[in-house]
Amino acid sequence: MKQMSSYPVRISRSADIRKTLSATAGIYRKAVDFFISVCMEEWDTVSACKGQTGKVNAVEAFTVKTSKRKTVPYDFGKDFYKFPSYLRRAAIAQAVGKVSSYKSNMKNWEASDPRTRGRIPGYPCAGYVYPAMYRNNMFVRTGTYTASI
């Protein structure tokens, strides 16, 4: 099986594009961290939902104002105004996965023998996550092997 990774690939020679992509990834990571903190606080409610979509919808109910939901306990729009909804949902899904993994690891750690278990699992954080840039409005294909942001 051949494995491929895009991390070491330089996307463009243009410093402006690299700065833009780096800034986009930084904002996305902050959004993931925001949703991780919400998931940690509201995990009992979020984990009770069925499927990934149900969990994402539950977190959105806590964080996203709508015409029917004028107030929310954690206002995502205050710090991330005009954040695209598809990136927001991807960030929520990423956060739900990280918190779910943390909770599972913590449960296993607590159940293991104190004399043989390792260190306590670390609090989840966004780390080096990247947003998927495959949506139609994320880039414009300019040729067979080229695109512009």
What is the role of each PLM region?
Residues 1-149:
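Nucleic-acid substrate recognition interfaces
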